[in-house]
Amino acid sequence: MTLFKIYLFLYLFGFLVPQKTTHPVLDNIALPVTIAHQGGNKEYPDQSMLAFDNSVSLGIQILELDVHRTMDGILVIHHDASIDRLTNKTGMIKEMTWDELQDVDGAYNWTIDGESYPYRGKEVYIISLAQLIEKYPDKVYDIEIKQMDPPIETDLCTMLRKYDLATDQVIVASFYDDIINQFHNICPEVAISLSVNKGTKLYILSRVGLERLLPINSVIAQLPLQFPSPIGKLRLDKRYINAFSKGDRQVWVWTVDDSSKMKEVLDMGVHGILTDRPDVLMSVTQ
């Protein structure tokens, strides 16, 4: 009864903030939502055209990817800020030109077993965001902004508008509130994903029924099964999913590669799964 009185007080005096609950991009995806994390990087090299081609051929709905910007202003698809981990060269993407990146073996160090390198020397390159969009103009994209400095939010917004994707074919995400808020200010028509930081706050508020205190302009929450917080590790559960899933909003979980775990989280009520194994996910959801 006390909690109800608190809630009523907050409601009557305007402390419960309006929250966004739908977006046109949600009309372009069906449940359960299948998302290829980095294109499916346990089947083909991370975020390579080979990986994206494979996921599209399997029928994956959404291609998830990360973006950075080269020194000469090209948005490229790559997880790390540097090219050191996967390629045969070293350097920071923001300090390299597009032409320099094209002289790199993008899968030189890519391996599944830690011993063999099946795509070394096979002409696997780091690709640009424009290349992928032009090849698959009708796909839905889940784009994480990785680069913080210099900022690339304006460049990304310009590209999404240029290719007419902004309204209903893109979800933009970032681990950092400042980045996602800045992008939303520049490109308000694009759907944005809840940051992990705000997701943690929502989790804590949902424990006491006060989730409406948190302003939310995101229609999708992308979270791991477990995530850290000031009060210890939190585990995604039905209570959290119900707290976020107002209107058409959806909860997607990452990164799930095991078929039994995929079935478990779908039974829990998640709407979508990000996976490095799109073949496994499609076998579960078809």
Residue ranges and their predicted role:
Residues 2-286:
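Phosphate-group recognition and catalysis centered on beta-loop-alpha active-site segments
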